[in-house]
């Protein structure tokens, strides 16, 4: 019988050793997971977003290998590590050197084996694949983490004055200050439009070029003043802080966040054994669309033209979507952690290895 991508998903084959399949009840719950409050009492002092939902869908189990691509404050990693037990392994990735100290503290407290890779996650996943690592789960918590936002010397926030930096890896060459000083007006406008979805990108880019010709833009407050002055007065008080989209755009560009994600998703998928799962928590539509498109492509079956009476392509889905729609925080979690408001979680399970040749 012909099967198209929108049809019933086939039952997954038996998972590889070390990658157990969720039981039927768990699988049903995973398809439409109930929202719940985030776990409390995390030793890092950081409340991980959508943590209960992530654990429910990934179902990390003793003896598995799990890869955390965005260690950050370590909140998700700690909860996962406690599930892996003495026979499991957690591989943590982060390009921010400040994450290393938090990882070292966590490593001394969790039962599983641990490993830290200081690198962009695309490069780290490629290296893990070259080593032959196989994982039961790989997950991403995209964007900034709390300590980056709250560290005044990092320049991520428009809420207080600080050096205009925004680098997740402070050893990288170009900071946001250098970007606004060096990029031409067309490049600035494109970055603000494409990465910030900023309606007033052209006006803001012109204002930046005009301002820097008079005096340097060196701090976050310098940039906020420049952006605010370029936006029409009625628009300054609609849709949140007037600099929000521009700061997002510059941060994404400086850190190549979307390029990293585009390269990392197929690499993460390749690390998974059959029955393993990939998850991503995103905080804006640019990330979420990429994750959604990637997972939907893996879950697609027949691609024959609709006029053909039977399938001749023979294509079978590689993935089962465990989240038909993105999972969002519960009202209780939002009350406890307003920063979670824009979070979206998507998860898929690997049904078979990719076809080659």
Question: For each predicted feature, which ranges?
Answer:
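S-adenosyl-L-methionine-dependent methyltransferase catalytic core, i.e., the SAM/SAH-binding region
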Residues: 1-357
């Amino acid at each position: 019988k012909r099967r198209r991508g929108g049809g019933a998903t086939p039952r997954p084959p038996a998972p590889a050793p070390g990658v157990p399949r969720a039981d039927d009840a768990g699988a049903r719950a995973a398809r439409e997971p109930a929202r719940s409050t985030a776990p409390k009492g995390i030793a890092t002092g950081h409340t991980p977003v959508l943590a209960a939902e992530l654990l429910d869908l990934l179902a990390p189990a003793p003896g598995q290998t799990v890869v955390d691509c965005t260690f950050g404050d370590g909140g998700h990693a700690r909860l996962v590590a406690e599930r892996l037990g003495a026979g499991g392994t957690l591989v943590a990735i982060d390009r921010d050197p400040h994450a290393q100290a938090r990882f070292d503290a966590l490593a001394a407290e969790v039962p599983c084996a641990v490993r830290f890779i200081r690198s962009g996650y695309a490069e780290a996943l490629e290296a893990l694949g070259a080593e032959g690592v196989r994982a039961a789960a790989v997950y991403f918590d995209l964007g900034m983490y709390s300590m980056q936002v709250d560290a005044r010397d990092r320049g991520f926030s428009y809420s207080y004055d600080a050096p205009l930096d925004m680098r997740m890896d402070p050893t990288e060459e170009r900071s946001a200050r250098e970007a606004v000083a060096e990029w031409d007006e067309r490049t600035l406008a494109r970055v603000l439009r494409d990465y910030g979805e900023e309606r007033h990108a052209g006006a803001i880019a012109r204002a930046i070029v005009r301002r820097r010709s008079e005096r340097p833009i060196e701090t976050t407050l310098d940039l906020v003043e420049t952006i605010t002055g370029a936006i029409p007065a009625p628009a300054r008080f609609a849709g949140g802080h007037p600099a929000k989209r521009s700061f997002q755009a510059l941060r994404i560009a400086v850190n190549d966040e979307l390029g990293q994600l585009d390269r990392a998703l197929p690499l993460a998928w390749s690390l998974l054994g059959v029955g393993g799962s990939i998850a991503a928590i995103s905080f804006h539509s640019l990330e979420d669309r990429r994750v959604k498109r990637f997972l939907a492509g893996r879950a697609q079956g027949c691609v024959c033209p609709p006029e053909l009476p039977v399938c001749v392509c023979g294509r079978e889905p590689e993935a089962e979507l465990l989240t038909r729609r993105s999972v969002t925080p519960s009202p209780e979690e939002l009350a406890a952690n307003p920063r979670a408001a824009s979070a979206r979680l998507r998860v898929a399970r690997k049904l078979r290895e990719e076809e080659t040749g």
